């Protein structure tokens, strides 16, 4: 079943407020908007064709009503070659969601005069951007078009963003309504992220904006409305800047930023189309990495120990997907909001592709899923206090989560709950192994990918700056880049055995849909979780056992799963309908980190870290010098080896974005995450966290 329409989300801004924050496009006719877009495109310098594709990176200062962005995306869809890709990074201080965007467009009637923009506008609305702080990555047309929405304080967004030397921002569009917020410091941060010949463009740019741009090394293109309505010959650069001193200042600024983040290393060698990336593992993380690489034209080779994908932790029939929130809305909470929304978009896109391709390509996997929402309730006094603290500590966007009373909880669930809770309207459940298979199916359509099944990698070795893999007498390689994404076996190799990550056994019970239980219309999350039925069964779980002695079916854990629901919802008749007597269940192993962040990035050279620690931590007097050393020196890594794991029990939410970010790192493209989050994901963080503070290991 699907949940009945829940109460309307409490959106707080009406049209007059929105139009004040996101004013209409300065280009008043469809023709002038189109002319301006073509002019912007003509001023772009052709980038190098890495991986057989050209990636154009553009920045936008402000969102406005979005017409400039829509026009650019439409032009790219219809007027450019298929081997050209576009990444637009939009910096907007005031977050906006899909509901408000639609309200803005409907009330202003801005799309009536530009009906050709309606399809891409609908695509953005379907992607469901949310009013959250941070970057939201939207991917369209199988990766040909990517939009990064950076919501929040402009200075924080810019200064915390890594520079991408291989693919810097080539052009900036400055919207008039935010021009007054451009300062010298912000202009220099824009310059840090940009190509040395990047241009700053705008309509009727103020003189102060042009001066700020010139003083930080930008050339400018100031376009008049008259030029766009007629002959565009007046749209010439007002000044071309080639000041070597300014360009040197940019270089120093980049070096300073890189030095400040040296403890989070970046790949030394970028991917190449004739060198496939090797991926060990066959779960959701591996599959999404393969897809993210394929969208960039990058080939990959996957090694899976099982006879098909999704037989490890990704093998459950149903898994809940919703964000992890904290009272502080800290880096962990913000990352999971970004990641959850990205994963949701992935599922939607792959599902849409499977519906379109079913007749032509019957092998395409259909993803069983239902975004029926997730209802979280407390199960005892302590958990209720924790949940209340989360609810009350932040003004959460209604599309992320909102509080409901007992009656509303009953209406959402369609069964008796009789307690207040926190509802995640965009959450739900998805079949993880079908998700993984669909991702690989799509990857195989976009790039040269290979999958080796029944191939358990037992050893990896590095020889002459290349990696080789061993399996049952076979040797695979050489590979310039090797990613370990093999879940419970992540620490089986000597190169990864010291990673600070722990395996936890989890048993998920399968119970038949019957009587009142079968009416459940949303995912319940309390002490354990319970999904709506799929193919006649509900999923109930899950146990959480560290250092388990075996991975067979456990009758005690089956009873404990039932007991969790009995504790969470006492005296509810539907709980009596949960029948575990069939002893149907599935056991998996989740790899968990202490801080609940996944691990993503360069594999740390732990032996070298410890050796340098001994060298620099000899006595208290040298402790401060040691602290400075680790803060400014690139952390030791195993060149060419990467980690993607530690997804814990929320891999459905976190895995796809972690994979997307790693794919961007491997190919040298701009990232959808900031430095603060990358530091939290860094596989070396457990050691570096102490070393950066001058503490003993």
Curated annotation (Swiss-Prot):
GO molecular function term, any single one: tRNA (5-methylaminomethyl-2-thiouridylate)(34)-methyltransferase activity
Chief localisation class: cytoplasm
Any one GO cellular component localisation term in the record: cytoplasm
Cofactor(s) required, per the database record: FAD
Entry keyword S-adenosyl-L-methionine: yes
EC numbers for this chain: 2.1.1.61, 1.5.-.-
tRNA (mnm(5)s(2)U34)-methyltransferase: annotated segments: 1-275
Gene3D superfamilies: D-Amino Acid Oxidase, subunit A, domain 2, FAD/NAD(P)-binding domain, Vaccinia Virus protein VP39
One Pfam match: DAO
Location of the protein in the cell: Cytoplasm
UniProt similarity note: In the N-terminal section; belongs to the methyltransferase superfamily. tRNA (mnm(5)s(2)U34)-methyltransferase family. In the C-terminal section; belongs to the DAO family.
Function: Catalyzes the last two steps in the biosynthesis of 5-methylaminomethyl-2-thiouridine (mnm(5)s(2)U) at the wobble position (U34) in tRNA. Catalyzes the FAD-dependent demodification of cmnm(5)s(2)U34 to nm(5)s(2)U34, followed by the transfer of a methyl group from S-adenosyl-L-methionine to nm(5)s(2)U34, to form mnm(5)s(2)U34.
Record-given protein name: tRNA 5-methylaminomethyl-2-thiouridine biosynthesis bifunctional protein MnmC
Organism: Shewanella sp. (strain ANA-3)
Gene: mnmC
């Amino acid at each position: 079943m699907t949940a009945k329409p829940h109460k309307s989300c409490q959106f707080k801004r009406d049209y007059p407020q929105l139009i004040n924050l996101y004013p209409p496009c300065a280009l008043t006719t469809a023709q002038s908007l189109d002319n301006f877009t073509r002019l912007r495109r003509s001023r772009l310098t052709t980038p190098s064709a890495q991986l057989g594709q050209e990636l154009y990176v553009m920045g936008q200062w402000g969102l406005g009503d979005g017409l400039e962005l829509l026009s650019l995306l439409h032009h790219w869809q219809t007027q450019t070659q298929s081997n050209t890709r576009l990444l637009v990074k939009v910096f907007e201080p005031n977050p906006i969601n899909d509901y408000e965007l639609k309200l803005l467009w409907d009330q202003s009637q801005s799309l009536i005069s530009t009906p050709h923009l309606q399809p891409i506008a609908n695509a953005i609305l379907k992607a469901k951007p949310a009013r959250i702080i941070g970057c939201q990555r939207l991917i369209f047309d199988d990766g040909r078009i990517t939009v990064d929405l950076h919501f929040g304080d402009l200075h924080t967004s810019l200064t915390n963003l890594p520079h991408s030397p291989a693919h810097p921002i080539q052009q900036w569009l400055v919207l008039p309504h935010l021009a007054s917020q451009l300062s010298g410091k912000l202009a220099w941060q824009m310059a840090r992220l940009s190509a040395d010949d990047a241009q700053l463009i705008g309509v009727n740019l103020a003189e102060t904006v042009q001066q700020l741009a010139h003083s930080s090394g930008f050339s400018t293109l100031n376009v008049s409305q008259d030029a766009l309505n007629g002959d565009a010959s007046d749209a010439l650069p007002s000044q071309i800047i080639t000041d070597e001193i300014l360009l040197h200042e940019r270089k120093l600024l980049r070096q300073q930023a890189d030095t400040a983040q040296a403890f989070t290393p970046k790949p030394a060698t970028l991917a190449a189309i004739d060198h496939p990336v090797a991926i060990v593992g066959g779960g959701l993380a591996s599959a999404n990495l393969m897809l993210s690489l394929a969208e960039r034209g990058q080939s990959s080779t996957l090694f899976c120990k099982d006879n098909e994908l999704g037989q490890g932790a990704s093998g459950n029939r149903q898994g809940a997907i919703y964000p992890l929130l904290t009272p502080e809305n800290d880096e962990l909470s913000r990352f999971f909001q970004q990641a959850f929304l990205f994963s949701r978009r992935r599922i939607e896109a792959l599902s849409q592709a499977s519906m379109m391709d079913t007749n032509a390509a019957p092998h395409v996997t259909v993803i069983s899923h239902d975004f029926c929402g997730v209802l979280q309730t407390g199960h005892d006094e302590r958990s209720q206090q924790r949940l209340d603290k989360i609810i009350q500590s932040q003004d959460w966007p209604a599309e992320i989560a909102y509080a409901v009373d007992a009656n509303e909880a009953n209406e959402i669930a369609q069964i008796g709950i009789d307690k207040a809770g926190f509802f995640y309207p965009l959450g739900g459940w998805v079949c993880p192994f079908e998700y993984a298979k669909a991702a690989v199916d799509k990857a195989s359509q976009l790039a040269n990918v290979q999958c080796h099944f029944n191939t358990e990698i037992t050893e990896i070795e590095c020889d002459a700056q290349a990696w080789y893999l061993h399996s049952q007498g076979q040797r695979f390689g050489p590979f310039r880049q090797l990613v370990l994404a093999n879940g419970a076996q992540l620490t089986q190799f000597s190169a990864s055995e010291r990673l600070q990550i722990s395996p936890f056994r989890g048993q998920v019970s399968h119970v038949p849909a019957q009587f009142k239980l079968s009416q459940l219309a949303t995912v319940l999350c309390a002490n354990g979780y319970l999904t709506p039925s799929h193919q006649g069964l509900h999923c109930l779980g899950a146990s959480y056992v560290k250092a388990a002695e075996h991975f067979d079916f456990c009758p005690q854990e089956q009873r404990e799963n039932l007991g969790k629901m009995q504790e969470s919802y006492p005296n509810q008749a539907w709980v009596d309908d949960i029948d575990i007597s069939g002893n149907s269940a599935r056991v998996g192993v989740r790899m968990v980190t202490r801080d609940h962040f996944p691990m993503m990035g360069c594999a740390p050279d732990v032996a070298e870290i410890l050796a340098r620690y001994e060298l620099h931590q000899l006595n208290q007097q040298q402790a401060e010098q040691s602290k400075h050393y680790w803060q400014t020196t690139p952390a030791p890594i195993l060149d060419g080896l990467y980690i993607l794991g530690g997804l814990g029990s929320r891999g459905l939410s976190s895995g796809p974005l972690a994979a997307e970010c790693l794919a961007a790192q491997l190919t040298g493209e701009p990232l959808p995450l900031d430095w603060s989050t990358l530091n939290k994901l860094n596989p070396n963080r457990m050691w570096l966290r102490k070393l950066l503070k001058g503490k003993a290991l």
